[in-house]
Amino acid sequence: MWGFFGGAKKQDPKDTIISLRQQIIVLNKKNDNLIVQIQEQENLARKHVTTNKLMAKNALKKKKNLEKQQETVQGSIDSLQTSINTLETANLNLETMKAMQEGAKAMKQIHGNMNIDKVDKIMDETRDQVALSEEVSEAISRPYANAYDDEELEDELEALEQETLEGELTNAGHVKQDGVQVTPHDLPAAPNQVPAEEEDDEEEELRRLQREMAL
């Protein structure tokens, strides 16, 4: 159809391919019909080749004409098929190009506000934040520093040990007589002179108690 300005209306490649295929269908029917007619003329020539040579000769002439027509039709079919193949390839290339154009357009839109400097800056900031996060995690997991003076603790422990030993020795001074507990001042006064052997035993007992309390 001609437009208002005398130009032909552009036809979609797909519509053109459909039209060509329809034309091939028509030509194939004509080609099949010609093949049938060719075979009929050949059969007629064979039938009269011995009885009526003139009729047989005319049949062969018709056969030759039909064969030329069939060759022309077949050539047209082949040409149309080639055109269809070319159009299909071109249309496929066109659709591929359109898809690539859309993809490039989308990528351009995505990268519109992006450049290598911004990417490098973002990566640097990300690395800094990761390093900061690791430092914070390390600081949180680090145990508290020793808030006590070890020497002061040792002195306090020694004083406590001495106090405990003295208490134990005081309790050890109580003895039982006839089932009744008495204190040292209830016992008869001991002689001023203590045998050396008894002093050694007491010293040994005292050291033993100290060792037990130190455990």
UniProtKB/Swiss-Prot annotation:
Q: Which family does it belong to?
A: Belongs to the SNF7 family.
Biological process terms from the Gene Ontology for this record are: ATP export; intralumenal vesicle formation; late endosome to vacuole transport via multivesicular body sorting pathway; peroxisome organization; protein transport to vacuole involved in ubiquitin-dependent protein catabolic process via the multivesicular body sorting pathway; reticulophagy; vesicle budding from membrane
| Record-linked Gene3D superfamilies | 6.10.250.1710, ESAT-6-like
According to the record's subunit comment, the protein's assembly and interactions are: A component of the endosomal sorting required for transport complex III (ESCRT-III).
Report residue spans for region: Disordered.
182-215
For this entry, the protein name equals: Vacuolar-sorting protein SNF7
Q: Where in the cell is it found?
A: Cytoplasm; Endosome membrane
Q: Where is the composition biased (Basic and acidic residues)?
A: 205-215
Give the way it sits in the membrane: Peripheral membrane protein
Q: Taxonomically, which superkingdom?
A: Eukaryota
For this UniProt record, give its keywords in alphabetical order, as a comma-separated list.
Coiled coil, Cytoplasm, Endosome, Membrane
Pfam families, sorted: Snf7
Where this protein primarily resides, as one coarse class?
A: cytoplasm
Q: Which GO terms describe its cellular component?
A: cytoplasmic side of plasma membrane; cytosol; ESCRT III complex; multivesicular body
Q: Which GO terms describe its molecular function?
A: identical protein binding
Coiled-coil intervals, chain numbering: 14-85, 149-173
What function does the entry list? Answer: Required for the sorting and concentration of proteins resulting in the entry of these proteins into the invaginating vesicles of the multivesicular body (MVB). Also required for the proteolytic cleavage of the transcription factor RIM101 in response to alkaline ambient pH.
